[in-house]
């Protein structure tokens, strides 16, 4: 038996909230871009740097304040087996968690970051419920730190060193390479970066979703590391080679793969598995069409785009009982 998801977002009701967030967000993004270029000059003053930090803080505050109301709309639009999810997050509580997390991350030079993100995930998942039963997140910050170290920090060290040696403005004795050799080194670095990022995406997905709990039900993933990373890597490479045109198809194929390898278990017994039946060609046209409509309307159409894209993905996602 297949039980299906659905997404029933009312775009007209979501529009006022979206516009209230999007316009200030866009203004702050432009101001930050302009101010950051000013601070890059040799004559940048302390006041200009302070103004940039103030703008970044304002953007952070805006995002945090609107995050909960937006999630409340989006989560309540998700249905499973004709029953809606509910979200009971509080702006004050969420703002406090972020403020404390940012403070501790700064004074620990970023070391606390994984525990900060874990607390945010635990809170957001914990205030989400289905059929009056709350979900639970059991992920650990130490595990997330290990993921960051193994998939981002350590692999990026040689790439940064090579880039530094190639740049004459940074290195006192840059490597003597001809233009072709420099190009090949940059290409190799890019391919390695794709591999690193693919491993990071795999590890983050596994860390988050396999730590979700709903009553006695847990999610598990029956795929191995290298096949998963290889698939993500190939899709990223194709997106790069096509200058981003292929990106929607890449996203759909990765989503199909991740959903198809996700199982629901109860006490080590498989109860069901997820699946996705959406056609790549249909999704490719939908994603590009909705993206272009949002762009030409300067973002005003975005709520309708979110409603249509969300409905297509979720209505084609199902749970098949074992």
Model-derived features: positions:
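Short, small/hydrophobic-residue-rich motifs at membrane-helix boundaries and re-entrant hairpins
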Residues: 1-83, 89-133, 137-243, 251, ...
């Amino acid at each position: 038996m297949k039980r299906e998801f659905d997404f029933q977002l009312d775009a007209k009701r979501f529009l006022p909230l979206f516009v209230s967030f999007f316009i200030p967000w866009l203004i702050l993004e432009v101001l930050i871009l302009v101010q950051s270029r000013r601070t890059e000059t040799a004559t940048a003053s302390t006041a200009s740097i302070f103004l940039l930090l103030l703008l970044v803080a304002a953007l952070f505050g805006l995002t945090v304040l609107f995050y909960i109301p937006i999630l409340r709309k989006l989560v309540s639009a998700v249905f499973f087996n004709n029953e809606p999810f509910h979200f009971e997050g509080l702006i004050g509580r969420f703002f406090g968690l972020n403020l404390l997390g940012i403070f501790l991350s700064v004074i620990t030079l970023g070391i606390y970051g994984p525990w900060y993100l874990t607390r945010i995930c635990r809170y957001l998942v914990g205030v989400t419920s289905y059929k009056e039963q709350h979900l639970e997140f059991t992920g650990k910050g130490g595990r997330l730190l290990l993921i960051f170290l193994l998939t981002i920090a350590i692999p990026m060290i040689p790439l940064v060193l090579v880039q530094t040696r190639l740049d004459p403005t940074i290195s006192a004795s840059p490597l003597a390479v001809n233009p072709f050799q420099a190009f090949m080194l940059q290409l190799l670095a890019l391919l390695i970066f794709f591999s690193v990022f693919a491993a990071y995406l795999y590890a983050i997905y596994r860390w988050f979703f396999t730590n979700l709990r709903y009553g006695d039900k847990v999610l598990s993933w029956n795929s191995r590391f290298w096949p998963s990373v290889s698939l993500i890597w190939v899709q990223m490479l194709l997106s790069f080679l096509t200058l981003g045109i292929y990106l929607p198809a890449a996203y759909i194929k990765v989503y199909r793969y991740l959903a198809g390898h996700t199982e629901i278990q109860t006490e080590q017994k498989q109860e069901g598995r997820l699946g996705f039946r959406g056609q790549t060609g249909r999704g490719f046209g939908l994603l590009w069409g909705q993206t272009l409509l949002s762009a030409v309307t300067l973002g005003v159409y975005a709520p309708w785009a979110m409603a249509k894209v969300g409905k297509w993905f979720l209505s084609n996602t199902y749970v098949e009982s074992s």
